Amino acid sequence: MKILMVIDQFYDANNGMTISARRFVQVLRQHGHDVRIASTGSPELLADGETAYLMEKQTVPVFDRLIASQGMTFAKTDEAQLEAGIAWADVVHFVVPFALTHHGIRIAKRLHKPFTAAFHVQPENISSSVHLGNAHLVNSGIYHWFRSYVYQDCRHIHCPSALIAGELRRHGYTGQLHVISNGIDPDFTYRKQPKDDSLAGKFVVLMIGRLSIEKRQDVLIDAVARSKHRDSIQLVLAGKGPRRQALEHQAEKLGLSVRFGFYPKPELLELIAMSDLYVHTSDAEIEAMSCMEAFACGRVPVIADSPKSATPQFALDRRSLFEAGNSSDLADHIDYWLEHPEERIQMETAYAELAKQYNLEACVRQAEAMFEQAIAENEAQEEAPHA
């Protein structure tokens, strides 16, 4: 298949959605498909011989700094470039529900090209940025806006989890919902390695993710401060985002040594291998690739049981779930796993085994089936006699 992937940000892999899209594209190409990208970027970012349809960055007055701090970029639609890419493709896959996708769907319909769309942007990711993450009417309004702006025209919608598929159905989305995990990179497998000098002798608690309001790293910092073993714990928050300064101030006020940093993949693999426990405190999550990668490496997760997060689906028992937002309950869970190393080692193997269900190769095969269905339905519609 000739597949056009339309995504505002592809060549700057500094957020989970972009990293996931790049992995999908890599495997699709390994399967023999010709995949091209429509995205922001410049020619020097392309691989030798790569054809792409490049857009300029769209600036958003007032909110530009906030958008950048979240690791996001919006594309300024170049209609000619976008139409050239869509005309070339057998099928078009739209990744995010913003202006580039809105314009692309209009072009695809005009050219009678089949297309699919993914739902990767949870409304709470947007509303939390302006401290309205728990405002039901605001989040419902964003679901409605996404539906009217993009998804009402989509017959096939990729949902990374059953939770988000349920939310879409509840908010009146009528397309066929394909629940397909983003998948786990095969490089993330069970591993352990000796701790470096800075971590030696410490019980290392790790969380990976954007430092933003809805991720709730503040709960984890408070939980470590409440732990009976706080002096034995080294907390590592891997990620970047607008909340870093506030989190650093919180840790300093509580007298905790917290390591902050954004780690390239090789360093991240080493960090996971040196960690003892993985914690995921997020209130809102469509799937949580970082948590999946951690338990694929054999780290036992402790996950917030938020109703707006799909991540609790990965908990094998209640020992891996804590009450969302409750730092005292989280502290109890951290202490439990620290005090029961034999149980933790036993569960490490169980979680690494669980990860095999989310094999990236299998997930891409499911996406290919969705693309093929969209193409077949489009061909049947084109061949049908018109009144």
What role is predicted for each listed range?
Residues I184-G201:
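Acidic anion/phosphate-binding donor-loop and adjacent secondary structure
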Residues Q245-P266:
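Nucleotide-activated donor-binding/catalytic signature segment of Leloir-type glycosyltransferases, i.e.
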Residues G41, L163, G183:
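Carbohydrate-associated surface elements
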Residues R110, P123, V138-H156, H171:
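Membrane-proximal helix-turn-helix segments that form the acceptor-binding/catalytic region
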Residues D196-A225:
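Conserved donor-binding/catalytic core segment of Leloir-type glycosyltransferases
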Residues V300-D305:
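Short hydrophobic beta-strand element within catalytic cores of glycosyltransferases
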Residues P97, D283:
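Aromatic "clamp/platform" in nucleotide-sugar-dependent glycosyltransferases that forms part
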Residues L316-S327, Y336-P341:
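Conserved acidic donor-binding segment of nucleotide-sugar-dependent glycosyltransferases
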